[in-house]
């Protein structure tokens, strides 16, 4: 069975060294963390780590059990479609001269994206949505303009059924 991408939401105590201990656990087990975001929660003394890792089910289960043994870990939830919300943010820089600029702006408006920077020969676009929406925007833009660069970041967070504080 090939590894699949898994997203873990890990509620931890907001204390120095917790991130290092969690990252070391993944490293010792030979897992590469593909994406990591850490931020404060609504509870002042807690932080939430969102960790994306590729793994098969059995090793992921083992690492989850090991995470639960860490003293500063409060709760771990694997985020899936049913218990989370996901979005992708794309920053796309396109070559757009006076002749193609109106076409680009039309496409941007159609996808409810925003032009966030303008220069004489290029536009920078900010788009958010699911992966399909971002891919569709890129397909619409590519025939008429040259995409100079793009940076895409995907994130997932607990939805209403994925939030709680019990271990």
Swiss-Prot record:
GO biological process: isoleucine biosynthetic process; L-valine biosynthetic process
Pathway: Amino-acid biosynthesis; L-isoleucine biosynthesis; L-isoleucine from 2-oxobutanoate: step 1/4; Amino-acid biosynthesis; L-valine biosynthesis; L-valine from pyruvate: step 1/4
UniProt cross-references to CDD domains, sorted A to Z: ACT_AHAS
Domain of life from the UniProt record: Bacteria
GO molecular function term, any single one: acetolactate synthase activity
Top-level EC class as recorded in UniProt: transferase
Domain ACT: 7-81
Keyword field: Amino-acid biosynthesis, Branched-chain amino acid biosynthesis, Transferase
Pfam family, one: ALS_ss_C
InterPro entries in the record: Acetalactate_synth_ssu, Acetolactate_synth/TF_NikR_C, Acetolactate_synth_ssu_C, ACT-like_dom_sf, ACT_dom, AHAS_ACT, AHAS_small-like_ACT
NCBIfam families given in the database record: acolac_sm, PRK11895.1
Annotated family: Belongs to the acetolactate synthase small subunit family.
Subunit field text: Dimer of large and small chains.
PANTHER family according to UniProt: ACETOLACTATE SYNTHASE SMALL SUBUNIT (PTHR30239), ACETOLACTATE SYNTHASE SMALL SUBUNIT 1, CHLOROPLASTIC (PTHR30239:SF0)
Name of this chain's protein: Acetolactate synthase small subunit
The organism of origin for this protein: Mycobacterium avium
Organismal lineage: Bacteria, Bacillati, Actinomycetota, Actinomycetes, Mycobacteriales
Chain's gene name: ilvH
């Amino acid at each position: 069975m090939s590894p699949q991408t898994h997203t873990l939401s890990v509620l931890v105590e907001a204390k120095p060294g917790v991130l290092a201990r969690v990252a070391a656990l993944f490293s010792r087990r030979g897992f590469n963390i593909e994406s990591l975001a850490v931020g404060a929660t609504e509870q002042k003394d807690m932080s939430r780590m969102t960790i994306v890792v590729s793994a098969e089910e059995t090793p992921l289960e083992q690492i989850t059990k090991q995470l639960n043994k860490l003293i500063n870990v409060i709760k771990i939830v694997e985020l899936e479609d049913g218990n989370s919300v996901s979005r992708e943010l794309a920053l796309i820089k396109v070559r757009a001269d006076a002749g193609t600029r109106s076409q680009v702006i039309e496409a941007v408006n159609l996808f409810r994206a925003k032009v966030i920077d303008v220069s004489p020969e290029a536009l920078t676009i900010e788009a958010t949505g699911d992966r399909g929406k971002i891919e569709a925007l890129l397909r619409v833009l590519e025939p008429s303009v040259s995409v100079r660069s793009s940076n895409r970041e995907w994130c997932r967070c607990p939805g209403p059924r994925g939030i709680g504080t019990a271990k």
